[in-house]
Amino acid sequence: MTNFTHINKQGNAKMVDVSNKEITKRVAEAHSSIIVNEKIYSQITQNTNSKGNVLNTAQIAGIMAAKNTSTIIPMCHPLPLTGIDISFKWDSNNDDSYRLNITAVVSTTGKTGVEMEALTAASVTALTIYDMTKAIDKGMIIGETYLESKSGGKSGDFHRKN
């Protein structure tokens, strides 16, 4: 049976003590996506949304989310993040819908990883796009959110195999 590090001997939640862990460079990349209709695609790419620039706002929201991960996920450590980069790439689904792929890369030099920060950034970026465009279509689909890769730390590197 696996021992869960976030559970104490009494079975209660605890935050893992990382004080004895080695300080290393840590980077995590997470992905998410949102499928939108042609009207939303045009509004985003032509920057005509009445609420403002959708992608810039979503990037800022994703960055803020990464910085605040420890305040919304109980056992995450507050970390001094050294970099957060959120990027976008459009794909056409050839059926009058468009997929916006979201990549969030988060880095730090510290004693614990930034996987949760990257996943939170990617998720909140997609949620912000939904929020800013839902007046046009509430049928948007937020796609799979997953860790693509991580490096640094005792557990070593991880790269998703497709």
Swiss-Prot record:
One of its GO terms (molecular function) is cyclic pyranopterin monophosphate synthase activity. It comes from the Bacteria. Substrate binds at M75, C76, H77, M116, E117. One of its GO terms (biological process) is Mo-molybdopterin cofactor biosynthetic process. It is an enzyme of class 4 (lyase). Pfam families: MoaC (PF01967). Its EC number is 4.6.1.17. It catalyses: (8S)-3',8-cyclo-7,8-dihydroguanosine 5'-triphosphate = cyclic pyranopterin phosphate + diphosphate. Keywords: Lyase, Molybdenum cofactor biosynthesis. InterPro entries: MoaC, MoaC_bact/euk, MoaC_sf, MoCo_biosynth_MoaA/MoaC, Mopterin_CF_biosynth-C_dom. The active site is at D131. Pathway: Cofactor biosynthesis; molybdopterin biosynthesis. The keyword Mitochondrion does not apply. Homohexamer; trimer of dimers. Catalyzes the conversion of (8S)-3',8-cyclo-7,8-dihydroguanosine 5'-triphosphate to cyclic pyranopterin monophosphate (cPMP). Belongs to the MoaC family. HAMAP family: MoaC_B. This is Cyclic pyranopterin monophosphate synthase.
